[in-house]
């Protein structure tokens, strides 16, 4: 289990525990870049193994919705579960979706997550272009509740 997955589990557990909710009605995850470290490992395996005898685990864990799915499995949440991956706008769309679900009465509570990581190669790209270097790891979870 990579750093981001561990951080995702920890922050979501803390948010659920703090709100006395065992199973959220919905899980909405936002990510700008997804699980880059696992994606890079998968691409390296493709090159190293010449596209043969690849392990499916890295591929399955490289998709953006892996984090939200893992949290749903752990919390036994079989309801609404979606991941937004629209770059810097991901959290905004996740919050709008959570607000919509609550306002329409479809759910009473929503676990909203923001997860991202920065690999050394992404940091070097950012540095070369003069952009701000993203944090190595970002894992935040919070609960929105209908009154």
Identify the residue ranges that each predicted region occupies.
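Conserved active-site "lid/cap" helical segment
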Residues: 1-28, 32-39, 97
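Acyl-thioester C-C bond-transforming condensing/cleaving domain
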Residues: 21, 34-147
């Amino acid at each position: 289990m990579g750093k981001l997955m561990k951080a995702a589990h920890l922050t979501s557990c803390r948010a659920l525990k703090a709100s006395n909710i065992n199973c959220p009605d919905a899980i909405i995850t936002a990510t700008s870049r997804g699980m880059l470290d696992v994606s890079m490992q998968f691409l390296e395996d493709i090159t190293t193994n010449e596209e043969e005898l690849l392990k499916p685990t890295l591929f399955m864990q490289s998709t953006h919705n892996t984090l939200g799915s893992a949290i749903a499995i752990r919390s036994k949440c079989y309801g609404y579960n979606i991941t937004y991956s629209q770059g810097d706008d991901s959290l905004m769309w996740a919050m709008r979706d959570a607000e919509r679900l609550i306002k329409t009465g479809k759910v009473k509570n929503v676990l909203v997550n923001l997860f991202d990581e920065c690999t050394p190669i992404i940091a070097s790209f950012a540095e070369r272009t003069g952009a701000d270097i993203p944090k190595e790891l970002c894992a935040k979870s919070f609960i929105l509740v209908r009154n």
